[in-house]
């Protein structure tokens, strides 16, 4: 499990918007958000650019 869904919703994005902004398919984005696929380095970097105040550990590993 990760905090990606929570972060996305807090910032007013839907899954389609996030997938488009990250340059991935909706299906891939959904799998990562649901914890059914691991995020690659580029995916993590793009998320960090979109949400610079959140740490990678918080977003993907639920660590403060």
Where are these regions (language model features)?
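DNA major-groove recognition helix of helix-turn-helix/homeodomain DNA-binding modules
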Residues: 42-58
